[in-house]
């Protein structure tokens, strides 16, 4: 395959002195693995035939393939690299060796091509092509002009074919424009038809939407009215309930307190029980019994949180009714035992009875069972076991704690203001478990008989 190329080189370093300098024209005839080069300065012509063997043995560097090097060499000769980043060029004198004698021909030159492999690492490949000056310049120039004429003819033929292609393409373009116009007209017509149909459908849809909206709005209005009426009813009911509650609260405030009615006998009952147990509370020299009674009283005070002693405080004045004095000499003359206590007392056998007499008037011995610590004995909370309370009467009136009756000149009773020895008369219910008796008959006894039995 033969291929020819012509290129122009300028600003080449010339150290030979055989050229005119300035512009150089380079023509190459390319074969498969070789080429023929012609260089002229428009005055002289230099030529050389570069064979494959010369390229393989002399020009190609070691470690590079032949094809890679040949492609780089061809690229450097087809067009000058003005930037000098890939290729650089230089012309120098050629020194020929003949029969071990160096014959310097001043008319021959050497065309040097520098291939730059790495600009930063400064790796270059230098290739020198010797050129011999031709004696017949006319034949060489004839070859140049023949090539130029052939090149012009080939280019003209290519131009004609390209113009024909351009005309055909232009005609196709014009036809496509006409078709596009027709398509645009048809598109506009179809769009107008579709818009007309769509408007009709849209109007029908709007009518249906209006028809469906009207009942929905009516239903919403009805729902709002119903909800408002329900809210009003609820408000009225709430107001009525509040009024009823206020009326009930007022009635409760006006009605007498039930708590006072229930607590009064309870307080009196507990005070009576505590006074009943603490009859011998004046004596400070009891052996064992005083400690038991005091422990029981302490337990009762802790359970009731001192409420009974703070709430109920008996008062004694001239208007106070006569009080029950269980330690006096005359029982039946002036005092009576309450009716609910005035029963026949039938003592039952007791477990143990211990009586200790000291300098005090009376000693009561109580057998204490293990119970929780309480301040006073209550009939409801006391353990179910038999007790025997022994009270002895002593006629020794020298004891200041013993209550005694005193009368005026008119014969009226003077009340004793010694609160510790006075017990107010309060109604007391019969407690069979406390006194250990059987209520099996209706026979009433007096206070003296009851005390004698005790």
Swiss-Prot record:
Chain residue ranges for the region called Disordered: 233-324, 368-402
GO CC terms, sorted: DNA ligase IV complex; DNA-dependent protein kinase-DNA ligase 4 complex; nucleus
UniProt GO molecular function: DNA binding
Residue ranges, compositional bias (Low complexity): 233-258
Subcellular location as annotated: Nucleus
A Gene Ontology BP annotation from the UniProt entry: DNA recombination
PANTHER family: DNA REPAIR PROTEIN XRCC4
Name this polypeptide is given: DNA repair protein xrcc4
Species this chain originates from: Dictyostelium discoideum
């Amino acid at each position: 395959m033969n291929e020819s190329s012509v290129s122009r080189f300028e600003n080449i370093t010339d150290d030979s002195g055989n050229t005119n300098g300035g512009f150089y024209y380079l023509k190459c005839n390319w074969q498969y693995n070789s080429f023929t080069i012609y260089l002229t300065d428009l005055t002289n012509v230099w030529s050389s035939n570069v064979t494959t063997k010369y390229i393989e043995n002399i020009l190609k560097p070691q470690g590079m393939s032949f094809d890679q090097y040949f492609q780089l060499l061809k690229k450097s000769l087809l067009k000058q690299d003005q930037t000098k980043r890939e290729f650089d060029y230089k012309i120098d004198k050629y020194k020929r060796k003949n029969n071990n004698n160096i014959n310097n021909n001043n008319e021959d030159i050497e065309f040097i091509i520098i291939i730059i492999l790495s600009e930063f690492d400064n790796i270059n490949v230098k290739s020198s092509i010797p050129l011999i000056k031709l004696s017949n310049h006319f034949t060489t120039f004839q070859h140049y002009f023949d090539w130029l004429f052939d090149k012009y003819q080939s280019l003209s033929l290519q131009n004609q074919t390209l113009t024909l292609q351009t005309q055909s393409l232009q005609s196709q373009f014009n036809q496509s424009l006409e078709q596009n116009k027709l398509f645009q007209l048809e598109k506009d017509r179809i769009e107008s038809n579709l818009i007309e149909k769509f408007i009709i459908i849209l109007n029908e849809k709007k009518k249906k939407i209006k028809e469906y909206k009207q009942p929905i709005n009516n239903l919403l209005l009805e729902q709002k009215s119903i909800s408002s009426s329900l809210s009003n009813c609820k408000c009225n009911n709430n107001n009525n309930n509040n009024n009823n509650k206020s009326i009930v609260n007022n009635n409760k405030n006006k009605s007498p307190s039930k708590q006072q009615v229930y607590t009064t006998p309870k307080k009196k009952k507990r005070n009576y029980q505590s006074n009943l147990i603490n009859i011998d509370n004046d004596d400070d020299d009891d052996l064992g019994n005083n400690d038991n009674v005091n422990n029981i009283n302490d337990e009762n005070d802790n359970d009731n949180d001192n409420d009974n002693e703070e709430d109920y405080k008996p008062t004694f004045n001239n208007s106070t009714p006569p009080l029950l004095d269980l330690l006096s000499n005359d029982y039946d003359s002036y005092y009576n035992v309450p009716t609910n206590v005035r029963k026949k007392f039938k003592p039952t056998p007791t477990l143990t009875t211990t009586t200790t007499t000291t300098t005090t008037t009376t000693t009561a011995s109580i057998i204490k069972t293990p119970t929780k610590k309480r301040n006073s004995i209550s009939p409801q909370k006391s353990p179910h076991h038999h007790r025997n309370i022994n009270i002895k009467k002593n006629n020794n009136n020298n004891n200041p704690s013993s209550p005694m009756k005193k009368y005026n000149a008119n014969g009226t009773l003077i009340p004793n203001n010694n609160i510790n020895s006075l017990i107010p008369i309060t109604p007391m219910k019969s407690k069979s478990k406390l006194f250990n008796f059987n209520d099996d008959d209706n026979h009433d006894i007096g206070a003296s008989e009851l005390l004698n039995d005790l």
